[in-house]
Swiss-Prot record:
Pathway: Carbohydrate degradation; glycolysis; pyruvate from D-glyceraldehyde 3-phosphate: step 4/5. The keyword Flavoprotein does not apply. SUPFAM superfamilies: Enolase C-terminal domain-like, Enolase N-terminal domain-like. PANTHER family: ENOLASE (PTHR11902:SF1). This is Enolase. Its cofactor is Mg(2+). It comes from Beutenbergia cavernae (strain ATCC BAA-8 / DSM 12333 / CCUG 43141 / JCM 11478 / NBRC 16432 / NCIMB 13614 / HKI 0122). One of its GO terms (cellular component) is cell surface.
Length: 426
């Protein structure tokens, strides 16, 4: 038993230069650990509330000094003396202390920082890697890196509607080889863009952010890059999208590619896209409250492709349960800061997997050097992780942590590859 002896917090910067919170925990056996909390650019309306100061004279109102003081003055006195290994009890205490439905009283950023820092401290105290501490003896599956190599939408200053164009190295024999293939396609894409006189500036998540005539042009460029890198599209490397369609949905229509689209037109667009490209996954293809449209898309395409709920579910078990009942998706995007505690995150993943859904663990566009999500993806045997392009330190550190985990697992390590996408099988 290791007892929580001290809890501290500080304001740090995320990868976009905005403030976020870092929490540090000390145990009575001398163990210390810290956790940094990420922040999103395109956020779902139903996410747990991130607490910001609102003081326009500091960081344009985005400071988190109030959240820091909440950890030190309100949360710390309640959790000192807790057994750090009692994660569910700790998280339940934090949820009850907040008392709101969306963690808006204390702030999900304050709560999550404590939840993750305690988990890491408990793992270190037990002399276990975090993935093993959280996942137990069966944690062994290395995820397919869903690498966002071309950025649009809210992640880039470009005219491209779709937020993320990803490559998935499904044919690689190991995570190490998958990472290599993804990086080689990324560099090939830069070369292709340069050859065509297109911009090679980077978006928030390390992908290139050129202006393009259409979203299909982005996919076509990536296919050229896959071939240029020496790989076969669909066999070695597949494609995936995060449309983030809530960002361009208003008054019942999607402002997409220069004109309004009805939900039915969007479903038809995606159906044709899936027929034309080696697509394995589409995230947030429709707006976060268009449940019937989601169910329609799944009925049309769900036997062939993964339809991922991000803003739709916000890693919330209650919204996920509704989606399962309505057959509104077949995959869950997992973001720890959307729900605000490690326990609730694990509960959402368990519900998804028991219901036949896949799960994709994800970063946020505003990231820190924290690598928890790399361990989490292995802990829950998710089979998929989304943490940006193979560029920018806050993205690379997650990939590098997965390389270390693969080495640590040795012969027990299994790379998910094509099995991460059951609709590809057979």
């Amino acid at each position: 038993m290791a007892i929580i002896e001290a809890v501290g917090a500080r304001e740090i910067l995320d990868s976009r230069g905005n403030p976020t919170i870092e929490v540090e925990v000390a145990l009575d056996d001398g163990t210390t650990a810290r956790a940094g909390v990420p922040s999103g650019a395109s956020t779902g309306a139903f996410e747990a509330v991130e607490r910001r100061d609102g003081d326009k004279t500091r960081y344009g109102g985005k400071g988190v000094e109030d959240a820091v003081h909440t950890v030190i003055d309100t949360i710390a006195p309640e959790v000192l003396g807790f057994d750090a290994s009692e994660q569910r009890l700790l998280d339940t205490t934090l949820i009850d202390l907040d008392g709101s439905s969306n963690k808006g009283k204390l702030g999900a950023n304050a709560i999550l920082g404590v939840s993750l820092a305690v988990a890491r401290a408990a793992a270190d105290s037990a002399d276990l890697p975090l993935f093993r501490y959280v996942g137990g003896p069966n944690a062994h599956l290395l995820p397919v890196p869903m690498m966002n190599i071309l950025n649009g939408g809210s992640h880039a200053d470009s005219n491209v509607d779709v937020q993320e164009f990803m490559v998935a190295p499904i044919g690689a024999p190991s995570f190490r080889e998958a990472l290599r293939r993804g990086a080689e396609v990324y560099h090939a894409l830069k070369s292709v863009l340069k050859e065509r006189g297109l911009a090679t500036g980077l978006g928030d998540e390390g992908g290139f952010a050129p202006n393009l005539p259409s979203n299909r042009d982005a996919l076509d460029l990536i296919l050229v890059a896959v071939e240029k890198a020496g790989y076969s599209a669909g066999t070695d490397v597949a494609l995936a999208l995060d449309v983030a369609s809530t960002e361009f949905f208003s008054d019942g229509a999607y402002q997409f590619e220069g004109r309004p689209h009805t939900p039915e037109e969007m479903v038809a667009y995606y159906t044709q896209l899936i027929a034309d490209y080696p697509m394995v996954s589409i995230e947030d293809p429709l707006s976060e409250d268009e449940w019937d449209s989601w169910a329609h898309l799944v009925s049309e395409t769900g036997d062939r492709v993964q339809i991922v709920g991000d803003d739709l579910f916000v890693t919330n078990p209650e919204r996920l349960a509704k989606g399962i009942e309505l057959k509104a998706a077949n995959s869950l995007l997992v973001k720890v800061n959307q729900i605000g505690t490690l326990t609730e995150t694990l509960d959402a993943v368990t519900l998804a997997q028991r219901s036949g859904f896949t799960a994709m663990v994800s970063h946020r566009s505003g990231e820190t050097e924290d690598t928890t999500i790399a361990d989490l993806s292995v802990a829950v045997n998710a089979g998929q992780i989304k943490t940006g392009a193979p560029a920018r330190g806050e993205r690379i550190n997650k990939y590098n942590q997965l390389l270390r985990i693969e080495d640590e697992l040795g012969d027990a390590a299994v790379y998910a590859g094509r099995t991460a996408f059951p609709r590809l099988q057979g």
